[in-house]
């Protein structure tokens, strides 16, 4: 079975990576789909995020890294995914993700959304929190894969 895991991943966190690993274990294949969102100003370019995820998942079998714009269900169909994988950190995530899942279902009833709760030790993580910590010189090695930690240091050092 193939799961689509969509997101902006700006940057990829260890919480994201944990979900990818667990998704591979449960479903066999995970397509990590990086959203090209023209409405956002990401810290990392699309190519950088694709490379970060590719490097961080190189130890896993069954991971494909791609990008998309537009509707998640169209990306899922294009990559022959049977389900959409999403992570939940808190109840606030659930309310938002449930709304998106219902929207996706209304667009194409073929796709189910599977929610996995985040591992407790990653429940505080978000890409926004990671960038904020890195911006002020805090350690992020326990929050992101090594390749991302190095890229964050370079990004914020060059911004000074």
Swiss-Prot record:
| First-listed, main subcellular location of the protein, grouped into a coarse class | cytoplasm
Write out the residues that bind ATP. Answer: 8-9, 16, 87-89, 97, 122-128
Q: Which Pfam families match?
A: CTP_transf_like
Instruction: Kindly tell me the pathway this chain contributes to.
Output: Cofactor biosynthesis; coenzyme A biosynthesis; CoA from (R)-pantothenate: step 4/5
Task: Write down the position(s) of the site called Transition state stabilizer.
Answer: 16
Kindly report, in one word, the top-level EC class recorded for this enzyme: transferase
Q: Name its co-factor(s).
A: Mg(2+)
Which keywords annotate this record?
Answer: ATP-binding, Coenzyme A biosynthesis, Cytoplasm, Magnesium, Nucleotide-binding, Nucleotidyltransferase, Transferase
Q: Which is one GO molecular function term here?
A: ATP binding
Q: Name one GO cellular component term.
A: cytoplasm
Q: What EC number(s) does its UniProt record assign? A: 2.7.7.3
Q: Which reaction does it catalyse?
A: (R)-4'-phosphopantetheine + ATP + H(+) = 3'-dephospho-CoA + diphosphate
Q: Where on this chain does substrate bind?
A: 8, 40, 72, 86
Cite the InterPro entries for this sequence. Answer: Cyt_trans-like, PPAT, Rossmann-like_a/b/a_fold
Task: State where the protein is found.
Answer: Cytoplasm
GO BP terms: namely: coenzyme A biosynthetic process
Family statement? Belongs to the bacterial CoaD family.
Could you give the subunit structure recorded for this chain? Homohexamer.
According to its UniProt entry, what is the function of this protein?
A: Reversibly transfers an adenylyl group from ATP to 4'-phosphopantetheine, yielding dephospho-CoA (dPCoA) and pyrophosphate.
Q: Which HAMAP family match?
A: PPAT_bact (MF_00151)
> What is the name attached to this protein's record?
Phosphopantetheine adenylyltransferase
Origin species: Synechococcus sp. (strain CC9311)
């Amino acid at each position: 079975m193939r799961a689509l895991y969509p997101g902006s991943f700006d940057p990829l966190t260890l919480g994201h990576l944990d979900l990818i690993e667990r998704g591979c274990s449960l479903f066999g294949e995970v397509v990590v789909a990086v959203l090209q969102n023209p409405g956002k100003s990401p810290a990392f370019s699309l190519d950088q995020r694709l490379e970060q995820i590719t490097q961080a998942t190189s130890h896993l079998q069954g991971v494909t890294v791609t990008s998309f714009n537009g509707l998640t269900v169209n990306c899922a169909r294009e990559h022959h995914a049977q389900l959409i994988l999403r992570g939940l950190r808190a109840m606030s995530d659930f309310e938002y993700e449930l709304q998106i899942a219902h929207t996706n279902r209304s667009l194409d009833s073929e796709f189910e959304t599977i929610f996995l709760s985040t591992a407790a030790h990653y429940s505080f993580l978000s890409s926004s929190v990671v960038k904020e910590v890195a911006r002020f010189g805090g350690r992020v090695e326990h929050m992101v894969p090594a390749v991302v930690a190095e890229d964050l240091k370079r990004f914020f050092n060059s911004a000074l």
